[in-house]
Amino acid sequence: MLWQKPTAPEQAPAPPRPYQGVRVKEPVKELLRRKRGHASSGASVTPTAVVLPHQPLATYTTVGPSCLDMEVSASTVTEEGALCAGWLSQPAPAALQPLAPWTPYTEYVSHEAVSCPYSADMYVQPVCPSYTVVGPSSVLTYASQPLITNVTTRSAAAPTVGPPLEGPEHQAPLTYFPWPQPLSTLPTSTLQYQPPAPALPGPQFVQLPISIPEPVLPDAEDPRRAIGSLTIDKLLLEEEDSDTYALNHTLSVEGF
């Protein structure tokens, strides 16, 4: 007889579990505690190096044996503050030589010795209330009258003079020449004008009476009178003509 092993019923799939995070072998708190312990122990063993922003000091080499490593006997040190026997005596400083006095520079020339063209005597010559000439005597012109005379108030008898023209910058100095004869003594004009011819005696135009006929306007015919004069037959014919025209117009539009 064949014995059949009873088969186990098929296991149903387990329901999915919610996400509970990643399981760590060692908890995080323990790791942090260990890290802090290592940091504290390392700080006690190895001091932390402090970096200063100052420039590094120059290194000096010791000459001869150091004073601290030597065994100094009592006979060596005579007084407090005496020098150590191992130190090397410094050489005596060389005698300072006085500096020679400064030699004068041969090419230097005092500014007082140079004759500046602008160091000459300067003179001021007022030309007008708002203009003054400053310069040496060779530039100024000595005249009895000012160069510009158009600065006073104008009078009725004085001739009209235009404004002074602006000349170039480098203009020769002007010289004033006084007018020997005043304007009032000038001779008057000798040109004589002929008087106009007298008017012709008597009237030149003769007035003639002219009669202008008035235009006669044609009498406008009264439309009422024209309509009254027409007979009834003519009126009927005119109405028929107007009706036929309207009818023909409508027919042509409909046929189109």
Curated annotation (Swiss-Prot):
Modification after translation (UniProt): Ubiquitinated; mediated by SIAH1 or SIAH2 and leading to its subsequent proteasomal degradation.
Disordered: annotated span: 1-23
Major place of residence: nucleus
Domain of life (superkingdom): Eukaryota
Record's keyword annotation contains Transcription: yes
Swiss-Prot/TrEMBL GO biological process terms: cellular response to virus; germinal center B cell differentiation; positive regulation of interleukin-6 production; positive regulation of transcription by RNA polymerase II
Family assignment from sequence similarity: Belongs to the POU2AF family.
Domain text: In the N-terminus possesses a conserved domain OCA for bivalent binding to class II POU domain-containing transcription factors and to an octamer DNA motif.
Assembly: Interacts with POU2F1/OCT1 and POU2F2/OCT2; the interaction increases POU2F1 and POU2F2 transactivation activity.
Function: Transcriptional coactivator that specifically associates with either POU2F1/OCT1 or POU2F2/OCT2. It boosts the POU2F1/OCT1 mediated promoter activity and to a lesser extent, that of POU2F2/OCT2. It recognizes the POU domains of POU2F1/OCT1 and POU2F2/OCT2. It is essential for the response of B-cells to antigens and required for the formation of germinal centers. Regulates IL6 expression in B cells as POU2F2/OCT2 coactivator.
Protein name stated in the entry: POU domain class 2-associating factor 1
Lineage: Eukaryota, Metazoa, Chordata, Craniata, Vertebrata
